[in-house]
């Protein structure tokens, strides 16, 4: 795996994608000392509280297109969970960068599926992923690719396909 996947220097096996994303986020928080994460609207990263936000959204309730609200994916999320998640619109490079800029001092990580599995395998644009890579690198924020589903896109996953290496990956 370390030879095939650009972002892998070390591997930790888990029993599920949920555990994999939980551990990458936990590691990002430990490394940066920050607590917030950013995720794209419509992205599915498992069923733990940190990512059970804005998975399936109702446009009438999810805020403005340029400032999506963090919406619970299910009842029972821990108190304060929604305050720890910055939701950015998928493939809206300028809008997403603005949202990230507003929160950069508090963000531990940006987690993204390079190809949104829960909406029918919708690929991110190279421009969008490049902006995320550049922004996170410039601001000391960990970029996490959740490739639990999208890894199948090529022998080295979407990160090989796009030529963009995240700081951490889940697959």
Question: What is the predicted function of each stretch?
Answer:
Residues 107, 136, 143-144:
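Hydrophobic beta-strand scaffold residues
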Residues 2-106:
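PLP-dependent aspartate aminotransferase-fold enzymes
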Residues 113-126, 140-163:
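Conserved PLP phosphate-binding loop immediately N-terminal to the Schiff-base lysine helix
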Residues 1, 24, 37, 85, ...:
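Buried hydrophobic positions in well-ordered alpha/beta secondary-structure cores of metabolic enzymes
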Residues 10-14, 39, 112, 143-146, ...:
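General beta-strand structural signal in soluble alpha/beta enzymes
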Residues 81-84, 139, 164:
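A short helix-to-beta-strand connector/capping loop
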Residues 163-171:
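Active-site PLP attachment segment
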Residues 92-99, 115-139:
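Active-site core of PLP-dependent enzymes with the aminotransferase class I/II
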